[in-house]
């Protein structure tokens, strides 16, 4: 509404309100005011709502309520009655002109004014802040009468009506006058009174609003509002008559705000008393109003000037104190306390703070002086930040105590030492911290380190003692300190205030946080270790020597290297921090922490203590295992900690539980030590468990971790499963038993749900429920939630002969960690199936099929772990070839940040080295983000592992297209379930694109869940994390691999999984089956996707390239689509899947177009793919489409498992039911 229209409408509405008010005001002083306010509010609402005055209305309502409550009490009723009478008389005299000016509006105000004279006077006085001018309230009355009827009804000013016209102008002008000269009031009155009366009425709510401001202004809450209000009022008053009402409020606000906070009560009293007497007539007069406004302005200006002057002086003092810009830079951090700490340079902040309070200025000055003096020695800006960081690193207590001390009487000495300490000790502190981390991993926190550091190491103690001595007594360490001391004492009082701000202000660096976390983790680890040390000590002592932390590199020859190769330290700071975290658990490997610190998680020997807990040697005396197992989780660290289990290469032969020393030597002895240390990473923690060689007879995987909620069931034979330490993830150690099943231990136990332990070894029980997998069943277990599925190789049981490798390391964790597991296969033929481990968050892990045990290295955020021995690890995206010639290549998994993929080694039959896949495949790509490579692991020849789910559901085992799910589909944390069961690849080498698959394994093994691995969530064997049904399909859509996010197999995000042989699964994001790509990296040997995602399909089909984002994967033949790579045909001739869609990627049945056909909808839809080929396309984001039949396994691949993406629920109902049923079954198991 235009102001005029609004004013007019409001005026009409308010007039009746005014009349009502008049009647009520006259009738009853207090109640009438409240009633009038209510009526005025209603009128205002009606008027304002269309005018977009919702805010004004709220303000009006609040102001009206305030007035109603405050007015009656303010003006005593005797006073109010008296004043009302006086005002009413005055208004009668003054009102005629005012009324005439008002054009009849004044009459209504008169009635209102009559009732609330005293209240008005009080209000005017209180708001104006002057005893005389406040009384001019009658003047406002004239103006206010129109406006006030709505606004001041509570005041019940009968007198208002009398003076209203002139007062109205005056009052209105008052408001503007606060910001502007009296001229406005004088000029505005006549037009406004006459012409804008309706506007004024409309403005009435605003008048209340200004009053509301004044109310807050008194507390000091709304001073800004008052300022704005004044300016706005000045502007608004001309604009709208509302300002007429607001002027009154403005009057009140200025005094309350600056002037009247202390004086308001006095002013109110004076105004109430004086206004009725001599000032009553004056208030009506313009002159009185103007004079009052002028006085207010003068007072305000004076106050402002004073404040500005004080602020300026304070700023000058601060500047002088700081004696330089550097000092000023310091000041904000130290001096300004909380706000200043955020700002590097104090200038503006100081001023702002100064303006806020003189006390703050003084405090700031003192702080700045002390800080500035300190800064003089050091660089001005940087030292302060470093100091802050240092204080945080030393621990809040040290910095804080120093700051407090500074404030204290001896603050100057303390401050100088504190600042000097912060700066000088900072470097030593860092070194010391490092030493402490290595030597004293136990130091709980930066604080603890600070406290301990004095008494702790000589190096630490000397610098810190010096610092402390300085802080305690002002050491004359430097002239600067003396200066600081001198300056500080003068400002000691101020400094008292300052100390807290420095605490707030000191910057905390990521390092500080990391140190604290590490310290806390160390405490946890120490507590766990203390228990486990007794058991673990025997084991731990030897291994430390052997493999230092395993970095990414994995030992080339799995055998000899496992102990040695891993040593490479990782440069990652994150890894180092994790390692540091880990080392504390195995304090003995302090050296490890230093060197291994780099990649502690992986180094098996390092944390022998961890290993034994892990139950390294499964065969070893179970007695040891239990304790270690319990401890096993000592290594587990909660979030940040990473215990590194030492990798013990298990020799084929039994590994003694201690094994590490032995294994270090032995692992080479047998072809497949394959103990890959498994790491499980729970949320942030990684821990590796060394896989201990299993005793030949029984593979027992010791559960790495005990589920948090429930103890894992003990392994059948070992009974090993000690309740793991709390850590959720369990890394199963794989035993590389010769013979019989390899045990894969489920690598990681899902926090929420358990994965079944691999078959023979009941690895760790899932947290919630322990399930043990039947012994024979390929070990893959799928972790539920964690999606760590270790895919143990599906293989394990099949050929007893092959030592089935048991996949080696299991789950890495993931955030970024990949663990590579390689179980080395037993020596020759058997491929080791690597169990794939899912990463929680997406670290993929690779398992090396090859005999060499691969260590899964933990991957930190983007690093891929090294894979199986042969394979090299690729870092980000590079794919690593698996070196292993025959037996199995190991696949390396790389990790993607989100989804990692893990490669499995396919190593097919021993004979067939073929596995080019293994070489390539694994590596294929590691996608930095979520690469997943999985090679399907053929089970041993003769065994077809059949994905439980749809994988190869339709296929007859041995069928050309056995879907050979990658032996592990890596699971993704999110949803990856990890490995798909190994599919049989019917053809050994022949797979057209990739030889990945060992040739036909005759008997299929069923994966526990569906695919070899469970999906974390409910995915089928391959089960994608979320629920992709098909073993092969990834959660999102990749058929094979599960991806929680959608990477099919491994990749976290888009990784697709590789498909078993023909059916390709598509990854959600588009990676093609073979390897999902999280973000795009996928390595599929066969086709490559532009993004790097390719998946190779096992056996025949090549995978098509995956997509990086939306790449879908295509059918078997390896064709890669570039980005979105559509689909490849499958070599087998099985229908190829349709290409996935880049973003959406669904793969559809082979022929169908991505979009057309069932292609998955991108976002959450899922389309079922009809038809054969697996369709399971997944859509990249959330949509997953399950092919309708695919679930059934119609497609050659067997099913497209619909994958579930994050939110997408698209699964075929049948698939979901199956998944649910299977989940239940697995849990029952």
Swiss-Prot record:
- The membrane spanning regions, by residue number, are 41-61
Q: Where is the composition biased (Polar residues)?
A: 374-400, 468-479, 660-673
Principal localization?
nucleus
Annotated spans, Required for targeting to the nucleus and nuclear pore complex: 1-398
Chain spans, region Cisternal side: 1-40
Q: Where is this region: Disordered?
A: 1-24, 90-200, 296-507, 579-747, 936-966, 1202-1229
Record-listed Phosphoserine modification sites: 81, 322, 328, 348, 370, 373
Query: Where is there biased composition of kind Pro residues?
Result: 155-166
Please give an example of a GO cellular component term from this record.
nuclear envelope
In residue numbers, the region (Pore side) covers 62-1229
InterPro entries in alphabetical order? Nucleoporin
Name listed for the protein in its UniProt record: Nuclear envelope pore membrane protein POM 121C
Source species of the chain: Homo sapiens (Human)
The major lineage groups are: Eukaryota, Metazoa, Chordata, Craniata, Vertebrata
């Amino acid at each position: 509404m235009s102001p005029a229209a609004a004013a007019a409408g409001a005026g009409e509405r308010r007039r009746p309100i005014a009349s009502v008010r008049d009647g009520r005001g006259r009738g009853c002083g207090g109640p009438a005011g409240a009633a009038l306010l209510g009526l005025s509010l209603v009128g205002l609402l009606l008027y304002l709502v269309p005018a977009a005055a919702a805010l004004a209305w709220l303000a009006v309502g609040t102001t009206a309520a305030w007035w109603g409550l405050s007015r009656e009490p303010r003006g005593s009723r005797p006073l109010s009655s008296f004043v009302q009478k006086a005002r009413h008389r005055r208004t009668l005299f003054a009102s005629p002109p005012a009324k005439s000016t008002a054009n009849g509006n004044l009459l209504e105000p008169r009635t209102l004014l009559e009732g609330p004279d005293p209240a008005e006077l009080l209000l005017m006085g209180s708001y104006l802040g002057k005893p005389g001018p406040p009384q001019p309230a009658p003047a406002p009355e004239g103006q206010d009468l129109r406006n006030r009827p709505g606004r001041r009804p509570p005041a019940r000013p009968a007198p208002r009506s009398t003076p209203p016209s002139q007062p109205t102008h005056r009052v209105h002008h008052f408001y503007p006058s606060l910001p502007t000269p009296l001229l406005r009031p004088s000029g505005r009155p006549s037009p406004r009174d006459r012409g804008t009366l309706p506007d004024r009425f409309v403005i009435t709510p605003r008048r209340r609003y200004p009053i509301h401001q004044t109310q807050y202004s008194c507390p000091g809450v709304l001073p800004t509002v008052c300022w704005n209000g004044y300016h706005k009022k000045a502007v608004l008053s001309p604009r709208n008559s509302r300002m007429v009402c607001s002027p009154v409020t403005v009057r009140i606000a200025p005094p309350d705000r600056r002037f009247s906070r202390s004086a308001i009560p006095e002013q109110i009293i004076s105004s109430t008393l004086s206004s009725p007497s001599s000032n009553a007539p004056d208030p009506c007069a313009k002159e009185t109003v103007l004079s009052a406004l002028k006085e207010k302005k003068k007072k305000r200006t004076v106050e402002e000037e004073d404040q500005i002057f004080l602020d300026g002086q304070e700023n000058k003092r601060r500047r002088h104190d700081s004696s330089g810009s550097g000092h000023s830079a310091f000041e904000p951090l130290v001096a300004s306390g909380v706000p200043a700490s955020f700002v590097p340079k104090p200038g503006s902040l100081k001023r702002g703070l100064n303006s806020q309070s003189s006390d703050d200025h003084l405090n700031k000055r003192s702080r700045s002086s002390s800080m500035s003096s300190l800064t003089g020695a050091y660089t001005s800006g940087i030292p302060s930040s470093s100091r802050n960081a240092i204080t945080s690193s030393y621990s809040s207590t040290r910095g804080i105590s120093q700051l407090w001390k500074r404030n204290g009487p001896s603050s100057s000495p303390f401050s100088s030492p504190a600042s000097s300490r912060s700066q000088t000790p900072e470097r030593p502190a860092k070194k010391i911290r490092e030493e402490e981390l290595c030597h004293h991993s136990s130091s709980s926190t930066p604080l603890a380190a600070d406290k301990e550091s004095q008494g702790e190491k000589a190096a630490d103690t000397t610098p810190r003692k010096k610092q402390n001595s300085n802080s305690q007594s002002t050491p004359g360490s430097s002239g600067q300190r003396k200066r600081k001391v001198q300056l500080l004492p003068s400002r000691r009082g101020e400094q008292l205030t300052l100390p807290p701000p420095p605490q707030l202000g000191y910057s905390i660096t990521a390092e500080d946080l990391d140190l604290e976390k590490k310290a806390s983790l160390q405490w946890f680890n120490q507590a766990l270790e203390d228990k486990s040390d007794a058991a673990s000590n025997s084991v731990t002592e030897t291994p430390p020597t052997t493999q230092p932390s395993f970095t990414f590199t994995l030992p080339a020859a799995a055998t000899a290297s496992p102990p040695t190769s891993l040593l490479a330290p990782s440069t990652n700071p994150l890894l180092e921090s994790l390692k540091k975290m880990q080392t504390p658990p195995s304090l003995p490997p302090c050296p490890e922490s230093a060197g291994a610190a780099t990649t502690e998680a992986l180094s098996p020997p390092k944390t022998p203590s961890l290993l034994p807990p892990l139950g390294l040697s499964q065969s070893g005396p179970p007695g040891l295992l239990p304790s270690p197992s319990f401890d096993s989780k000592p290594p587990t660290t909660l979030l940040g900690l990473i215990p590194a289990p030492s990798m013990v290469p298990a020799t084929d032969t039994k590994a003694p539980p201690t094994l590490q020393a032995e294994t270090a030597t032995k692992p080479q002895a047998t072809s497949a030590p394959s103990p890959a240390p498994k790491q499980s990473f729970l949320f942030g923690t990684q821990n590796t468990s060394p896989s201990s060689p299993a005793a030949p007879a029984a593979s027992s995987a010791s559960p790495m971790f005990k589920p948090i909620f429930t103890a894992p069931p003990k392994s059948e034979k070992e009974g090993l499963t000690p309740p793991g330490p709390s850590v959720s993830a369990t890394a199963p150690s794989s035993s590389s038993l010769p013979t019989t099943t390899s045990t894969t231990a489920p690598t990681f136990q899902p926090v929420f749900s358990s994965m079944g332990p691999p078959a023979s070894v009941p690895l760790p029980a899932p947290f919630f429920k322990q399930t043990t997998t039947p012994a024979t069943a390929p070990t893959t277990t799928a972790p539920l939630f964690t999606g760590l599925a270790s895919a143990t190789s599906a293989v394990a049981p099949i050929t007893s002969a092959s030592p089935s490798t048991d996949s080696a390391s299991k789950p890495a964790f993931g955030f970024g960690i990949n663990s590579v597991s390689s179980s080395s296969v037993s020596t020759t033929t058997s491929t080791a199936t690597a169990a794939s481990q899912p990463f929680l968050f997406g670290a993929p892990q690779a398992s090396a099929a090859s005999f060499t045990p691969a260590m899964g290295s933990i991957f930190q955020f983007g690093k891929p772990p090294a894979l199986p021995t042969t394979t090299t690890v690729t870092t980000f995206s590079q794919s690593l070839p698996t070196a292993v010639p025959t037996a199995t290549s190991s696949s390396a998994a790389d990790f993607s940040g989100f989804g990692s993929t893990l490669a499995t080694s396919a190593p097919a039959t021993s004979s067939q080295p073929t596995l080019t896949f293994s070489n390539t495949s694994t590596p294929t790509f590691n996608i930095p983000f979520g690469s997943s490579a999985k090679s399907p692991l053929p089970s041993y020849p003769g065994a077809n592992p059949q994905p439980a789910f749809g994988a190869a559901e339709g296929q007859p085992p041995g069928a050309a297209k056995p879907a050979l799910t990658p032996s592990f589909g890596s699971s993704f944390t999110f949803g990856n379930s990890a490995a798909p069961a190994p599919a049989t690849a019917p053809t050994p080498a022949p797979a057209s694109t990739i030889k990945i698959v060992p040739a036909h394994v005759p008997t299929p093994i069923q994966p526990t869940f569906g695919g070899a691995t469970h999906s974390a969530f409910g995915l089928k064997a391959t089960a994608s994390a979320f629920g992709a049904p098909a073993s092969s399909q990834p959660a999102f859509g990749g058929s094979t691999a599960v991806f929680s996010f959608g990477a099919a197999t491994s990749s976290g995000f888009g990784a697709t999984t590789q498909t078993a042989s023909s059916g390709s699964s598509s990854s959600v994001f588009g990676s093609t089956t073979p390897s999902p790509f999280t973000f795009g990296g996928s390595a599929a040997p066969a086709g490559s996707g532009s993004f790097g995602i390719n998946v190779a399909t096992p056996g025949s089909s090549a995978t098509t390239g995956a997509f990086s984002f939306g790449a879908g994967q295509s059918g078997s033949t390896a064709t890669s689509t570039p980005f979105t790579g559509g689909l490849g045909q499958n070599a087998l001739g099985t229908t190829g899947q349709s290409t996935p869609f880049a973003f959406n990627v669904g793969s559809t049945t082979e022929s169908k177009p991505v979009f057309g056909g069932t292609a998955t909808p991108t976002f959450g839809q899922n389309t079922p793919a009809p038809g054969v080929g697996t369709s399971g396309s997944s859509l990249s984001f959330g949509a997953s489409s399950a092919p309708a039949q695919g679930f059934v396994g119609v497609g050659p691949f067997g099913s497209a498992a619909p994958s579930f993406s994050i939110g997408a629920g698209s699964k075929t109902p049948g698939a979901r039911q199956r998944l649910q049923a299977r989940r239940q079954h697995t849990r029952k198991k």
